Amino acid sequence: MSVQWTDEQQRAIDARGGHILVSAAAGSGKTAVLVERLTQRVINQEDPLTADRILVATFTNAAAKEMKTRVIEAIEAKIKVAPDDLYLKKQRQMMNRAQITTIHSFCLSILRENYYRIGLDPAFRIAEEAELLLLQDDVLEEVFESFYASADPAFYELIDSYTSDRDDQAMLTLISNLYRFSRSLPDPEAFYDHLIAQYDQPIDPDESSLLTRLFELEWERVGPVINRYMELSYRLRQSGYDEMADLLVQDVTPVRRINPEQDRWTTVALAFQAVEFGRWKGIRGDEEMKKFQTERTRLVSDLKKMRDLFVEKDGVDYLEDLRSQLGHVEMIVTLVRSFSAAYLEAKQQRGIVDFSDLEHFALAILEENGEPTDVARLLQERFIEVLVDEYQDTNEVQERILRLVSKSDEATGNLFMVGDVKQSIYKFRHAEPGLFLNKFKRFQQTEVGTRIDLTKNFRSRLEVLDGTNHIFRQVMDEAVGEIDYDEAAYLRLGNLGYVDSTQVDPELLLVDQTDTNKEELEAQVIATRIIEMVNDENPYLVFDAKQKRFRKCEYRDIVILVRSRGKRVQALVDVFEQYELPVYADTTGGYFQATEIQIMMSLLKTIDNPLQDIPFASVLRSPIFGLTDRDLGRIRAKSKDGSFYEAAILVAKEQTPLGLRVDEALNQLHHWRTEARGKSLASLIRSLFDQTGYFEYVGCLNGGRSRQANLNALYERAHQYEASGYRGLYRFLRLIHRLVERGEDFSEARSLGEDEDVVRIMTIHQSKGLEFPVTIVSQLGKQFNKQDQIQAIQLHKTYGIALDAIDPVKRLRSGTLLKEVIRREMDREMKAEEMRVLYVAMTRAKEKLILVGAIKGLEDQLIKWQDQPLDELLLPEMDRRNAKTYADWVVPAVLRNFLLSEDGPRWSFRIIALDEIAPYQELTKMVEQLEHVRVLEKIDHAGDETLNIQIEAAFAYQYPYQVATDTAAKQTVTELKRTEQLERAAFESTHRQSTYYRTPQFLGPTLTGAERGTVLHLAMQLYESGRSFEEQILDWEQAERISSLEAQTMREAIPELTTFLASDTGQLFEQRLLAGEVYRELPFTYKIDSARFRSDWHGPSDQAVMQGIVDCLIRDGDTYILLDYKSDQVFETTDNQNQAEVLRTRYATQLNLYQEALEAILHIRISRKLIYAFALHEVIEIY
């Protein structure tokens, strides 16, 4: 069945003559239209055009391949209908030569054919990123060394002004960043000249283009404030507060006289200097007046900040400060030019180019002195049509190249551009949406070009489209989003195949952040909503277009979109695992954070230099050597001042189990250091895998294949590093450090495939071009990233480089005029980009759109968000400009949904209470995460080791709550139990002394009673059902999970251990262990009133945080049994029954507290509390 194209789509397919811009909204079938246009051009025999005379430029190899494949398939389908058509067969063959390619590949083809024109070695290759990073570092260091050697005063003054006392890394980074930034522009040399010119402004405020621009940018903020002032004044007058209304008018009268079209800086500054704020005369008890006063206070604060810009510093001072930094900028330009030339020479010597070179070398071949070369003119003749996909993502260099190979006259040209400026989200790659916007506005006048708008969306339900339109028509316009979201931009329903449903309204879910971890709380809200959608009782129904019916929502239908990677994605993954929800985190990155990579990197760092404490200790603690935290503490205790390596050497000299193990580790490290000097890096890494057995070890862990893939990737990266001509472990480690420093990463291998029934997590950027039945947009409460705006040195393509003004005598720095301009420009551009990112995220949804945010101080924020005027469609410009999060745009727009129109777009809005968040699906997963439990109510000083308030004798009174000063805010259960026992002991006046003495250490290694108890606990923790203790102890010892001394202690205690297993409780333990219903060594944190464990507490109600570790929890039907192991002796009596009673009394408090904490945290019921006393070989029940 043939495709039924809309009128706009057909126009885009058929349009000829002149440059054509197709503005294709999300889901409008852009790719299908482009493929159809291509297909029609090559199969049309009335207007013959061979496939090799079309250039199609894309941004990814995948897009180019898909487009070429689809055109070929379309031609082959025509051939099946007309098998004897020679023209079609010829076109099919010509498709192999068609230039459907990425811009970089097209540039590469120009270089391969014309390398001799620019003196390029024909054997050049495209270098790996790692090789380029190392080369850049080497060249930069050489350039800086040469300047240090030259003793140039200007260079030394620059270094002294803008680097720290420790090193010059800040300036090295600046030169590197400035170089990369300049390469996104067609003429880097002209840009360097522009940098200098910006600091050479005339000292005349009214003639300075920078001061004029600063005023324009500030007026964008002042204008809306004045409007809010006048609107508030009007409401005051309507309410009968004429005097206060006049006061507001008086506040802004001087600035209302400013004519932003004509007035210059001096006039504007005088107007702001005349601003004075009169005294507000409130009326006691008048609540309406209080609200007006609060609004006015906020407006006064905003206007004062704006006034300060014009009053605190004179225009002449701004310009003189700028001029004072001219010498510094000239030196920076000298440095970057020196680096650029040296780096180019170094690449030529190695016969390599980078992707930036591909574009600039192609540009040099195509253009000379601003005019097209013979090569460019030949290409203009060759290509009858030049099509550009995703035009909104081009940069200025790429735009220049495309213009040079196409016909230049816009009215008669042959450039066909497709894209959507509302989806331009690659500014970090120097994409320039202004190129699209410029044509978007000009091409409305058809004589200079043709603009075709594709507004029908064939992806989404009407509810999704209406919900998206409802938000963006209120927040996006040219002032804030760089484009008006008007009728022409509205998403319109194109897919009429959806069947009506009552479940499809878009949702906004907000939760109050309180003091809970924001990422984890938000993840729990999302997990709870997904559980609701996929449950069997009342599932969300997805419409199956192929079967024309609804079906139950599956995990694979759902995507969660995040703004950025890192801990936020990990929080989602962790919570989903706790809820036992299948999840696939489709993220590039996390490789260097993977445990197995961190351990191997620590090992390589230690081999390179064992004096690095953290890597060395990490390796000792890792499974490679298997030392414990206690072992590391003993090593550090040997030498508190020296390095950890030096302390280890001292321990290795001791004839103790620890000394022997440390000695063995040091010998092994020495062997590997020797090996490193004689082997290639890749061979060394492979040898480490083999010798340590670590490769096989990680293969046995969860996700073993992925972990092994990560290790193999490290080996391959080392191999590539050496293939680039570099050698040495130190340089490899420096390369990895640079990659991490720049935020670059490798892809972490994943064991779960994309096609499986899992919830997907991906960044919004990764989702671009994709679609999903259910789209959950998270992180609405995440603050926008303003790092670029707070850097000490800032870069901007129009305004250059912003430096602080430095007073060399006073050693003071202050902001400059350029910094004020660039910071404001960057903020405008960032807000527009973030608005486009949000648009991309929301338009991924086919059937269900859910927005989620954890908001700090939600109640106060809601009061602010709902206080919006209803007389205009757009939200106030000032509020939109001041937005710090997506929620600042989305929530006010959604709230107005309930006020503007009864029949408007349907948004479901819910505030999620903490008790609505679903409990974890299985106790197992909850238990594994108990260490992450957070008390939701804030407890001051809960993290202190002790909370002792020292009362000096000088105070003349007795502090009434002295007991509180002796009580730690964080108590272990053992400490609580000990407190009770001490009080009871004091009451009974009982004094006992053990007749058992510890064997002196010089008589041989032995364990204290407490250490022996720890070993027995460890045995019960490691025990696996179905095998004897003898076998398992041998395995643990051979695997170095326990020391030989610990193994000996366990063997001696086998009778005590097996007696427990033979008991009724032990048999239940074995049964439940096989069923996976025994939970061991469970850490927890719980809040408790201090008075509960201090009988002499007479202070105010106060709380402490209790910490403990539960030895064992056994599921028994619908309840649980709490089991604790005790190895201590009872000396008060020799009668077993009496001894049991002593232990029961001794530990009743502890187990009662355990029960209370676990029942509160896990929402379970504990039916029995038991002690197994190893010394008595007896199970004792606590009542």
UniProtKB/Swiss-Prot annotation:
Reactions catalysed: Couples ATP hydrolysis with the unwinding of duplex DNA by translocating in the 3'-5' direction; ATP + H2O = ADP + phosphate + H(+)
GO molecular function: 3'-5' DNA helicase activity; 3'-5' exonuclease activity; ATP binding; ATP hydrolysis activity; double-stranded DNA binding
GO biological process: double-strand break repair via homologous recombination
Keyword Transcription in record: no
Transmembrane stretches, start-end: none
Swiss-Prot/TrEMBL cofactor(s): Mg(2+)
Protein's UniProt keywords contain Lyase: no
Location of the UvrD-like helicase C-terminal domain: 473-769
PROSITE patterns: UVRD_HELICASE_ATP_BIND, UVRD_HELICASE_CTER
Binding site for ATP: A24, A25, A26, G27, S28, G29, K30, T31
Key words, A-Z: ATP-binding, DNA damage, DNA repair, DNA-binding, Exonuclease, Helicase, Hydrolase, Isomerase, Nuclease, Nucleotide-binding
Domain UvrD-like helicase ATP-binding: 3-461
Record function comment: The heterodimer acts as both an ATP-dependent DNA helicase and an ATP-dependent, dual-direction single-stranded exonuclease. Recognizes the chi site generating a DNA molecule suitable for the initiation of homologous recombination. The AddA nuclease domain is required for chi fragment generation; this subunit has the helicase and 3' -> 5' nuclease activities.
Family: Belongs to the helicase family. AddA subfamily.
Name this protein carries in UniProt: ATP-dependent helicase/nuclease subunit A
Organism phylogeny: Bacteria, Bacillati, Bacillota, Bacilli, Bacillales
